[in-house]
C-alpha cells in the first residue's frame, strides 16, 4: 500500500470519490420517474372508481328499501292509490338506472377473471346481487298485489248491483284502497287502464333487472363463481386469488383448516 512521505495514507481525490459513488448508486432515469408516477396515478384512479361504485351500490340498496316500503303500502286504506303508484314508478325507475350504472362501474374495475381480486370488489358483487334479487322479488309482489286488487274491484262491480251510499261508505273502510269506491264509471275505467299500464311497466322493468342479474353472474370473478352462497358470506379480509392445483409429495392426505 502506498503512503505519503510523512507516513500518512494517501486518500483518494474528490474526483475518485465521486466516481465511486456514481458507480455504486446510479441516478434514476426519467423513465423510472414516469413509471412511478403512472403507477400511483393508476392506483388513485382505481380507488376513486371503487369509492364511486360503493356509493352507487349503497344508494341502490336505499332505493330497494324505499320501493319495498311502497309495495307494503299497496291496499292500505290511508294511502291514495294513484299517488302511491306514481311514487312507485318514480322510485322503480330511479332504482333501475342506479343498478345499471353500478353494474357498469363494477365490471370496469373487477379486472381479469383469474387475477387477484380486492375483497371490497367481491363484497360489492355480492351486495349488488342480493339487492337485484330483492328488487325483482318486490316487483313481483307489486304485480301480484295490484293484479289481485284489480280483480277484486272488477268482481265487486259485476256482483254488486245498485247499492245505497251508506253501504258504499261502510264497505270503503274495509276495502283496500285501489281506487275511490265512490268514483264514476268513467273514472273507474280510466283508473283500471292506468293500473294495467303500471303492471305492464313493472313487468318490463322486472325482466330488465333479471337480465341484468344474469349478466352480473356471468361477469362475476371466478373465485366468486366457484363458491356457494354460504361461503360468500364469510369473505376473507385478504385479496382472493384463483386457486391452482399443487402437488404435495410424501403426504397421505391434506387437511385444510
From Swiss-Prot:
GO BP terms: namely: G protein-coupled receptor signaling pathway; negative regulation of signal transduction; regulation of postsynaptic membrane potential
Query: What GO cellular component is one of the record's annotations?
Result: postsynapse
In which residues does the motif Nuclear localization signal occur?
242-247
Tree of life domain: Eukaryota
The alphabetized UniProt keywords are: Cell membrane, Cytoplasm, Lipoprotein, Membrane, Nucleus, Palmitate, Signal transduction inhibitor
| Compositionally biased region (Basic and acidic residues) | 32-45
Q: What does the UniProt PTM comment say about this protein? A: Palmitoylated. Undergoes rapid palmitoylation turnover. De novo and turnover palmitoylation are both mediated by ZDHHC2. Palmitoylation regulates the cell membrane and nuclear shuttling and the regulation of GPCR signaling. Upon depalmitoylation, it is targeted from the plasma membrane into the nucleus. GPCR signaling inhibits depalmitoylation and promotes localization to the plasma membrane.
Tell me where in or outside the cell this protein is found.
Nucleus; Cytoplasm; Cell membrane
Q: Which InterPro entries match?
A: RGS7BP/RGS9BP
User: Which segments carry the region annotation Disordered?
Assistant: 1-45, 172-191
**Residues lipid-modified (S-palmitoyl cysteine):** 252-253
Comp. bias intervals (Low complexity): 180-191
> How does the protein's chain sit in the membrane according to the entry?
Lipid-anchor
Give the family, as the similarity comment puts it: Belongs to the RGS7BP/RGS9BP family.
Assembly with partners or alone: Interacts with 'R7' family proteins RGS6, RGS7, RGS9 and RGS11. Component of some R7-Gbeta5 complex composed of some R7 protein (RGS6, RGS7, RGS9 or RGS11), Gbeta5 (GNB5) and RGS7BP.
How does the record comment on the protein's domains?
A: The nuclear localization signal is both required for nuclear localization and palmitoylation.
Q: Give the function comment from the record.
A: Regulator of G protein-coupled receptor (GPCR) signaling. Regulatory subunit of the R7-Gbeta5 complexes that acts by controlling the subcellular location of the R7-Gbeta5 complexes. When palmitoylated, it targets the R7-Gbeta5 complexes to the plasma membrane, leading to inhibit G protein alpha subunits. When it is unpalmitoylated, the R7-Gbeta5 complexes undergo a nuclear/cytoplasmic shuttling. May also act by controlling the proteolytic stability of R7 proteins, probably by protecting them from degradation.
Name this protein carries in UniProt: Regulator of G-protein signaling 7-binding protein
